[in-house]
Amino acid sequence: MGANSFGRFFTLTTFGESRSAGVGAVIDGCPAGIPLCADDIQKELNRRKPGSSGPFSTKRNEDDICEILSGVFEGRTLGSPIAVLVRNKETSSKDYENLKDVYRPGHADYSYDLKYGHRDYRGGGRSSGRETIGRLIGGAVAKKMLEAFAIKDGKKTIEVQVRAEEIAGIKTSLPLKEDEALPEPIFEKLSALASNGDSAGCILSCSVLNVSEGLGSPVFGKLDAVLSQALMSIGAVKGIEIGGGFYSASITGSENNDISKNFSGGILGGISCNMDYPLNLNHENGRKDENTCQIDFRIAVKPVPSIKMNQASFNKKGEKCMLSVGGNHDICLFPRIVPVVEAMCYLVLADAFLVSKIERF
């Protein structure tokens, strides 16, 4: 199966299936000498670990302990491929025996069978959310690399902020952090959905702070294009808008060009930049200081497709049937999806940073 790798110079390859012996990642292109230890990766894994994100997350029994197999020695990267493994505890197929010949609606069961003619039906196999563990591993390494270069260059470190602005169709009064308690209306809505064997989606607002200007490679390596690809590759993400997004289509050119706003989302012509002159003008010399920029975007996350409610579908013979998906599953992917979104941002920026070093003397 192709397309399991991401990046040009800083590359991530993920491996493993939902119920295989393990999942993990191989990162290549990370420079030597970057401080890195297992704890740097583990703290990110703990944020998406099953059962650790409140009453509406999956109760699947997994420890999600990372093992660094190569590429790191005495707390620093070697410049060689970094291989990291997370072993799966739950590898039994008992919850999926009744589904091996039936296609679950909203899943990749049918499309994988259609394309490959052979698939791992246990928990979705390669299309499972367990695949995102490899992304967290890569994102953790990318984050450490960007931090190291920021410290070396005397710059602020990049910070990715992901908040929920809508859950289960209910808007939050203020963007909700992953560790904040759910507002009562949302909690009650999710509780009702869980009781009915149903699930919910969410809309996330995201800001990436302290991004160096000049990242991105026109025309097919535009930063917003690569960022969109990275985020849309997350299985549950079904939409993205950068900056003003669809709102930009409803305003005038003069409004959209207003440099006191950030309708561009911090990216123009596919290159990260900050045209917010009034806020960044150096009044002593009358020029805009060389600065960082802020990338703003929103993403739509679909409802979890594994639900206990009876649904109509069909089997391999093309016969209609009704099915209910058992096992342990999330009711909503917030907040467990937050570190996954962050990881993809760090991967995109780490790669763009390395690419930028060879694009200009």
UniProtKB/Swiss-Prot annotation:
InterPro entries given for it? Answer: Chorismate_synth, Chorismate_synth_AroC_sf
Q: In which pathway does it act?
A: Metabolic intermediate biosynthesis; chorismate biosynthesis; chorismate from D-erythrose 4-phosphate and phosphoenolpyruvate: step 7/7
Gene3D superfamilies membership: Chorismate synthase AroC (3.60.150.10)
Q: What reaction does this catalyse?
A: 5-O-(1-carboxyvinyl)-3-phosphoshikimate = chorismate + phosphate
Q: Does the keyword Amino-acid biosynthesis apply?
A: yes
Q: What is its EC number?
A: 4.2.3.5
Gene Ontology annotations for the cellular component aspect, listed alphabetically: cytosol
Q: Keywords of this protein's UniProt record, alphabetized?
A: Amino-acid biosynthesis, Aromatic amino acid biosynthesis, FAD, Flavoprotein, FMN, Lyase, NADP
UniProt cofactor note: Reduced FMN (FMNH(2)).
Q: Which Pfam families match?
A: Chorismate_synt
**Which residues bind FMN per the record?**
126-128, 269, 302-306, 328
Return one Gene Ontology term, BP aspect: amino acid biosynthetic process
User: Looking at its record, which EC class is this enzyme?
Assistant: lyase
Q: What GO molecular-function term can you cite, just one?
A: chorismate synthase activity
**Cofactor(s) demanded:** FMNH2
Q: To which protein family does this belong?
A: Belongs to the chorismate synthase family.
Assembly and interaction partners? Homotetramer.
Q: Which PANTHER family match?
A: CHORISMATE SYNTHASE
Its biological purpose is as follows: This reaction introduces a second double bond into the aromatic ring system.
| UniProt name for this protein | Chorismate synthase
Q: What species is given as this protein's source? A: Treponema denticola (strain ATCC 35405 / DSM 14222 / CIP 103919 / JCM 8153 / KCTC 15104)
